[in-house]
Amino acid sequence: MREIKDFLKDYEIYALREICEPFEIVEDGATFAANALIKARAVQAKLGELNLADEFIALSDDSGISVEALGGRPGIYSARFSDMNERGQITGNSATDASNRAKLIAELKALNLTSSPAFYTACIAVSSNLGDFTAHGFMHGTAINEERGSNGFGYDSLFIPKGFTSTLGELDDATKLKISHRSKGLELIKYVLKSLERKFGR
């Protein structure tokens, strides 16, 4: 949320809890785009129920890391990786950032690897009365089998962006904002927001 607000400073950004009571959204899509759209459409539908669909648009994102040595996993299951069994099924609801990182480290070590090419994907979705839109951003680099740095969340301490020697967990926020997959997706979605400005009286 902070990254979105920092990047879209020309817009008034509200968290869902500032508009209405948060509600559960089941993310059962097979791609980042599908899950991002599921969330944006669900929020837009709620805005319609509250007669706010002409005042707001819904923006959501779905993101994750794909590691080459793991066949692209965890991918869309990045937030639930440690709940995934050997058959690729999600069997629990106890995953944390720490447990997900531990699983990634363990799987790389099981392959006798200290690192692997990897990339982050972020899909930004917008849902409005004028339609639904998506934009993707990517950040390529290397996943490593030891944690370095504590500035961040998720897999930040295990990922070295291309062109850097430090992990995301070791980089400052300003640098990460410039290079992140989410920022790249948000840069593209700005074109969508700009095209919607007249509709919302900007």
Which residues make up each language-model segment?
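Anionic-ligand binding patches
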Residues: 1-202
